[in-house]
Amino acid sequence: GPYNLAVTPDGKLLVSSLKGGGGVQVFDLASGRSVFTMKSSTTGTHGVAISPDSRYAFLSSEGVGSDPGKVDVYDLVALKRVGSVDVGQQAGGIAFWKMEPRSR
């Protein structure tokens, strides 16, 4: 079921990691309905972070056995997984920090 939750900065979507089987579920906050559900690339889905422009969700997954943990990247406009990156085995939480270009 739902494990960690994050609301997109624009306030339109709620993204949930699904523990126990691994996956992601996205809800439209205006209607309260699920608009997308997908299995993650591993079973230990954990943390959720959203890009500042509300376009992408990043979900961390713990590694199982000797498999590495992963961060899956989901496009919240196209509603599909667009990438996956191997990370350390204990990839529990995740945070997104927006960096602004320096003024000259």
Question: What is each stretch, according to the model?
Answer:
Residues 1-104:
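Predominantly soluble domains enriched in secretory-pathway, periplasmic, or organellar proteins
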